[in-house]
Amino acid sequence: VDMGALDGTGTAAMDGDLLALHSETGMAAVPWSAQANGLFDKMARGALDTLRPAHRRLYAPPENQRRFERARQLAAETGLSINQIVLGYLMSQPFTTVPVVGPRSPEQLEDTLRAGDVLLSPEQVRFLETGERA
């Protein structure tokens, strides 16, 4: 997330300090827009231009292109969809995470529901975060 794009919105993003707080305390997280308005799915479909300009500024900094490439690689290795990788990543944190989702079609809803059983290994989480393999 481009933190500068959040200025004046009243919205907070999970940065390193907040991630550490949740990890250390076990406090649950409820990420709103857990799928970043479908960013990675849109990237996978070559439809990034359908993302609203404000959302593109917020969710599409260069680091997310690198994260997308890693998510796409992991999706190919596991047979999961990009959406399932994204939600699986959130639900594989060392604290309870309850992603808020907003599917816009029956197909998106089905894909999202299938993500409910996805737990990634610590190695897969590390790969998504850093690109490093064990």
In which residue ranges do the predicted regions lie?
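Beta/alpha (TIM)-barrel catalytic core signal, keyed to glycine-rich beta->alpha loops juxtaposed to Asp/Glu
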Residues: 1-133
